[in-house]
Amino acid sequence: MLQRIRLNLEAVEAMLYYWQAASEKDNIAESFFYDVAKMPALSAAYDEEFDGESVRRALSAIKNRERFDGNKKEKKFWNNNMWMMEDLEYTRSMANPLKKLNLDSLVSELQGTPGSDKIEEVEVIFSPLHSDEYIISGNRLIVNFFRIKPNDVDEKAYIGEKELKLYIKEKIEELLQK
């Protein structure tokens, strides 16, 4: 029976550091790129076109202010990361609602959903993905951080036209029914 929904912002926190440091031309160790590439938040999106080496190459090119050449997914990942560095204030406004996000109420709301009796814990991970809006992998819902749209008026966030918490609830329902 579903008892917990855990929020994982590890990849977003790491990338917030990276975007700030890279924009200020600080030195970022190459080992950082390898560590980020190993995070489950990113590795869940790996396939024959996009892998850990894609992540490392894109982030290294940004840090070193080099031109980047890659396939469509790699270029999308590189472009999204460049976009985050253009306006760090906007980037922070995307991250702030996540830091305040409390998903505890969804546990009771999802009781009775088909499949909720088979999984004890769901992990909701926010990740800087290339093009996928979200990925369901086992008991993990991985949401593309780049798809978050902050709202200046009420400090809520949206993905598409859906308020973030409602979006997460709908995707967890999908996860539970798989």
What spans do the regions from the language model cover?
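Active-site recognition of the HExxH zinc-binding catalytic motif
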Residues: 143-144, 149-178
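Auxiliary, metal-adjacent structural segments of Zn-dependent hydrolase domains
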Residues: 80-150
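Hydrophobic/aromatic-lined pockets within catalytic cores
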Residues: 20, 111-118, 172, 176
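Charge-rich, solvent-exposed alpha-helical interaction surfaces
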Residues: 58-61, 97, 109, 167, ...
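N-terminal low-structure segments adjacent to metalloprotease catalytic domains
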Residues: 1-89, 94-95
